[in-house]
Amino acid sequence: MPRRKQQAPRRSAAYVPEEELKAAEIDEEHVEDDGLSLDIQESEYMCNEETEIKEAQSYQNSPVSSATNQDAGYGSPFSESSDQLAHFKGSSSREEKEDPQCPDSVSYPQDSLAQIKAVYANLFSESCWSSLALDLKKSGSTTSTNDASQKESSAPTPTPPTCPVSTTGPTTSTPSTSCSSSTSHSSTTSTSSSSGYDWHQAALAKTLQQTSSYGLLPEPSLFSTVQLYRQNNKLYGSVFTGASKFRCKDCSAAYDTLVELTVHMNETGHYRDDNRDKDSEKTKRWSKPRKRSLMEMEGKEDAQKVLKCMYCGHSFESLQDLSVHMIKTKHYQKVPLKEPVPAITKLVPSTKKRALQDLAPPCSPEPAGMAAEVALSESAKDQKAANPYVTPNNRYGYQNGASYTWQFEARKAQILKCMECGSSHDTLQQLTAHMMVTGHFLKVTTSASKKGKQLVLDPVVEEKIQSIPLPPTTHTRLPASSIKKQPDSPAGSTTSEEKKEPEKEKPPVAGDAEKIKEESEDSLEKFEPSTLYPYLREEDLDDSPKGGLDILKSLENTVSTAISKAQNGAPSWGGYPSIHAAYQLPGTVKPLPAAVQSVQVQPSYAGGVKSLSSAEHNALLHSPGSLTPPPHKSNVSAMEELVEKVTGKVNIKKEERPPEKEKSSLAKAASPIAKENKDFPKTEEVSGKPQKKGPEAETGKAKKEGPLDVHTPNGTEPLKAKVTNGCNNLGIIMDHSPEPSFINPLSALQSIMNTHLGKVSKPVSPSLDPLAMLYKISNSMLDKPVYPATPVKQADAIDRYYYENSDQPIDLTKSKNKPLVSSVADSVASPLRESALMDISDMVKNLTGRLTPKSSTPSTVSEKSDADGSSFEEALDELSPVHKRKGRQSNWNPQHLLILQAQFASSLRETTEGKYIMSDLGPQERVHISKFTGLSMTTISHWLANVKYQLRRTGGTKFLKNLDTGHPVFFCNDCASQFRTASTYISHLETHLGFSLKDLSKLPLNQIQEQQNVSKVLTNKTLGPLGATEEDLGSTFQCKLCNRTFASKHAVKLHLSKTHGKSPEDHLIYVTELEKQ
């Protein structure tokens, strides 16, 4: 006994393998059973009880050894509880042993039984066992010896067989049943072997004991409540779920509870008989299988949540079972289509049902079922919130899988709806067939825009909508706040926006505000994609406040709702692969990045709620908007202010796509500003849901033209246009306060614009100063989204830019305020240093990279401030790999590459057939290269090996093509010149390097470097003619970053990309065209 005490603390229960725990439990049960068994064999066994107990102790050494302790130790990290349990168990077992040791006990099993009963009575006298003790005594007095023996055998692990105790939840089998099964079990086992305790029985006892003791034990006396709780969950996790989890391995019969399974196994004999071997063998033999069975039960619990037939809700233990089921029942054909409607009726609260009914009927006459759709989606949302089956605690929803069904059914009418005619369908196949037959899939975009226009313009609907107050939660994209109101305060814009939303939706008048909002979102989503300039004209904007309906407002409303909807992930439209696709404007130069969406446009407008990323994005966008703001303010502080403002007003997002459209128009404008604006829209999109923006951009642009007052449509709510953020146009920028952001929007967006607008906008004159170009672009963009801010005549000029093209977005500011642009022009007018712009662009880039799931601007934007003419090597050092373009730009020093390429070319050997054979560079050459370049020998070897691999595999690499054909073409990475022979190629590279390869081994490093510097000027001049294989023979091009000259635009682009990590689109900014002398 003392030995047991000493050893108990050695291992905390938490660290004892489950198998040992279980084995120990079984052993202990056997030990206690020995005294309780009625068999004569058992009486003999009792003679050896002490030795047996000692043996068992070897298994019980760990604190878990005691049955109770075992349970407690199942997952308990507390060694104290284990020790406590071990000690307790030790004392109890000591008592047990002492009793059986009496000679009487040997010959009189009944006596020993009585003694053991007494021992257990004492043991149960503990407060925690009070109810168990009562049960024990009751059953002891009322049951037969068989029952008594069974009860006591299970007592150590209070098991259900004791009827009263077994009344725990699902395992409450009637006392007679459990007792009888246990009795038969124990008798069977006892006859087969002295220790015969069936592991099924043990498992059952353990389970029941845990459930009962969990309720009984207020303190962690025998079991740790934590352990019990955890184990209880593991064993019973699905007992109450109705999923048949306990399966008989022999016949696959499924039972809801372990008790039923155990009874079945006992009655049918579907279990292994070898589990009744002697204790030592038994423990070893069954420890793994028992552990495995328990682990299976636990794993299956999780698996069944996934391996569930979505039609009938049956759970399966394996994917194979589920597959067989689906194949045999053909349920896989019915899953998304015919789901049990009863599930919906059961699960949807009556109030929800009523709401659904109420909402559906009022469908407004407009697009058939639109109102209904909105109502449905709204009610579906409510259901989602109210549905008791979808609580956070019950993530898996209705146990039989009906949750999927009812959720789908509840929204089916909304989901499976034709966006053209509004007809709902029962199945996706039907909807698809309908779209194909009617050709509505082609008309969706245009018809949606028409509908959107109708909705917007219908005065009756407008009035109705206006009559319904929308909660400020609707996205306050209001920056485009109603044109009439043109509220300067974000609150005002919010209100107007709310109004707009309903107006545009002009869905069921009767529906509650939420319903309308939902509908508006739906309709927005549907219409926005199609609401293009063709439908909304500037003329429309002029009479915009028709019947009290403000087109701009409604547009804003629509966009905001769409954005919020997109954000919430409840798409109501049907025919688009993605939100972005749904809202891409045909006129926009580039689709908004899907990532943009993630930046929330949500009801953060309410104010600070807006997520930081969104706010930051907005801030970034803002900066463009506030071109006028003083550049002297520190970039960081300015950005912070912008972020704050943006956070305060989510309207920024409302700006929507207009910026996108502006993008395209800007591109045409060819002014750098256009570029900037373009970028803005992208950024905005990133922050705000692009999907909404797109449509709003379209409609918003049109609206903007009409009621500039609604400048908010830009998303700069009332921005107060003080700053007349030309970028407001990028309106997304800011819903933020009318105060202009202090960062020059041009500088903040320059990098972004450069990246995205380079292709779209062709500067009027390539030689035009980049700042001037940006200015123009921003002006054009600004005038479009002009917020009713400072009136600027520039807006007119911009209008010209944009409106020359019918594709250009409508100038929403045209009809109302044109002053907006002026301030922007002023701000732009003050020339900003290119380096300053770059710094800001870096800031923007960092922010966008961090905030937006996917920055709308390519990483190439990360153009560090290389503008100050630092050498290309320095520029390379400054550019972190993160900022570099991965595919086309390498981290290699261009000079090192030239040396390696020249050496490799010199190592090629020409055969008599005219083909070239690659021969390796000798160690000496490698050493020379290493000494000169500072590259390690390993790096050089890797480079050579990579080149050889590429040549063998594809016959070419970056600087050498067609080697395998016998007609190799060598390319100069620096100037893009092509050469047919290795010798001319090497000599050309040497002109770049400023020294001969032969000198590499002879000249000291410092001398070579000096020679390089001296020859650099000559090289630049001579390279012109050498590399001028392209069209521009009349001029040379100089890289502003490193002052090198090149013979062609292509060469400069290559150089910018490879050496400086700049996008070729940026060549206008970093390249100077020089007349040849």
UniProtKB/Swiss-Prot annotation:
It is found in: Nucleus. Expressed in brain; strongly reduced in post-mortem elderly subjects with Alzheimer disease. The lineage of its organism: Eukaryota, Metazoa, Chordata, Craniata, Vertebrata. It is linked to Aural atresia, congenital: A rare anomaly of the ear that involves some degree of failure of the development of the external auditory canal. The malformation can also involve the tympanic membrane, ossicles and middle ear space. The inner ear development is most often normal. Different CAA forms are known. CAA type I is characterized by bony or fibrous atresia of the lateral part of the external auditory canal and an almost normal medial part and middle ear. CAA type II is the most frequent type and is characterized by partial or total aplasia of the external auditory canal. GO terms for cellular component: chromatin; nucleus. CDD domains: homeodomain. Interacts (via homeobox domain) with APBB1 (via PID domain 1). Probable transcriptional regulator involved in developmental processes. May act as a transcriptional repressor (Potential). The keyword Hydrolase does not apply. One of its GO terms (biological process) is middle ear morphogenesis. Belongs to the teashirt C2H2-type zinc-finger protein family. Keywords: Developmental protein, DNA-binding, Homeobox, Metal-binding, Nucleus, Phosphoprotein, Repeat, Repressor, Transcription, Transcription regulation, Zinc, Zinc-finger. The keyword Lipid metabolism does not apply. Residues 1-109, 139-195, 269-298, 467-549, 647-720, 848-873 are annotated as: Disordered. A zinc finger (C2H2-type) spans 246-270, 307-331, 416-440, 970-992, 1037-1060. Disulfide bonds: none annotated. This is Teashirt homolog 1. Residues 885-955 bind DNA.
